Amino acid sequence: MLRAWPVWGALGLLIIGTVGTISHNSDPSCSDHGGAIPREWADDVAHAAEVSALPPELVAAQLDVESRWDPEAESPVGAQGLAQFMPETWELYGEGEATDPEASIRAQGYYLRDLREMVSELDPADEQEETDLVLAAYNAGPTVVLEEGGIPEYQETQNYVDQITELSETRYAGVCSEES
């Protein structure tokens, strides 16, 4: 009888694993992402993507680059929270504390939406150029991007745009799509 326990135990784990995989893959929502986006903020990321009309993969990648998903993150220049809002920008877009993850992601969505509208006056050639301009405006400020007529020559901003784009196409690819 003792020899049967490993077999029954293995069978039980196989069944549990199969049921877990089936239930995990049955929901195509953003909250069923396979671990790239912290589960507790997946719906917030999906909402920010909807508000901003940008892909959820991009919103998630931006949060990763901004704060590495640390709601208590604070930059040397005073940006705070998951989406790293400067106090002046938080006053315009945020509600409550910048360190509140849900509020930070919600504000990110609205700010990205407004940045998208601002950079549209530069008449981007395509969706990718528009997205790059939005990211550059988030990093360097919309005034700089508009005055430069595009992505400024700041290495930090150029790296920022490239890093988010790459992460959105690799680590976060498909995290909120029907195929994931």
Where in the sequence are the language-model features?
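Cell-wall polysaccharide-cleaving catalytic domain and substrate-binding groove, primarily
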Residues: 45, 64-89, 141
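Non-catalytic cell-wall polysaccharide-engagement segments
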Residues: 1-44, 50-52, 88-106, 110, ...
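Intrinsically disordered, low-complexity regions enriched in Ser/Pro/Gly/Gln/His and often acidic
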Residues: 1, 34, 62, 80-83
